[in-house]
Regions:
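Pyridoxal 5′-phosphate
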Residues: 1-214
């Protein structure tokens, strides 16, 4: 059995035919399929562990809390964060960005300030900042792309000013797969006193992430 077949066999949803052909799924950028190890872990949780976390001292409550905090520690190690307190669980990237925009954005962006985004952004990393800019009477600035769909450090720098408060950028484009130079952009943003917000939904599953280094 080749490595491709071995990996495919870990995804039971692919063991079916569509239009008389073996199913090939190419929409993982929107919603990824789950391997057996994940399906089995979720199944085991609901069969043997499920309870409220951080709410009770009974056996199931303790098991659920341990599993919950264990998952937080696994994520911390996976993205190489320094402290487990840095890891906050949400329903997904869209919800997470909306929370940041409606809390940090609404608190720290003032009239006349600037928010910088790129033309590569998923709507989840665009619409929340449009809303913040509109409500706070701030300016939303867009970074142009090269002819082949890339974001350059120079193009980002051209949009920064002393009024820049937030730079929001995808690490990897969900449409083109373009890898953006977020480390260099973060350095420029911080030099201006701005906060860098990275949408890493497409990069974290496919490349090594070190949020401390970024």
């Amino acid at each position: 059995m080749g490595i491709d077949a071995s990996i495919r066999n870990q995804f039971p949803i692919l063991d079916q035919q569509v239009n008389d052909r073996k199913l090939v799924y190419l929409d993982s950028a929107a919603s990824s399929q789950k391997p057996l190890v994940v399906i089995n872990a979720i199944d085991d949780y609901y069969k043997t562990i499920h309870s409220n976390v951080h709410r009770g001292v009974h056996t199931l409550g303790t098991r659920a809390t341990d599993a919950y905090e264990g998952a937080r520690e696994n994520v911390r190690r996976f993205i190489q964060a320094q402290h487990h307190e840095e890891i906050i669980f949400t329903r997904g990237t869209t919800t997470a960005i909306n929370i940041v925009a409606s809390s940090y954005g609404m608190e720290h962006v003032e009239e006349g300030d600037e928010i910088v985004v790129t033309y590569l952004e998923h709507h989840a990393n665009l619409i929340p900042w449009q809303q913040v800019a509109k409500r706070k009477k701030a300016k939303l600035k867009y970074v142009d792309l090269t002819a082949d769909g890339r974001v350059t450090v120079e193009a980002v720098e051209a949009q920064l000013s002393d009024r820049t408060k937030i730079v929001a950028m995808a690490h990897v484009s969900n449409v083109l797969g373009t890898i953006n130079p977020i480390k260099e952009v973060a350095r420029l943003a911080h030099a201006r006193g701005a906060v860098m917000i990275v949408d890493a939904a497409q990069s974290a599953p496919h490349q090594r992430i070190n949020v401390t280094d970024l």
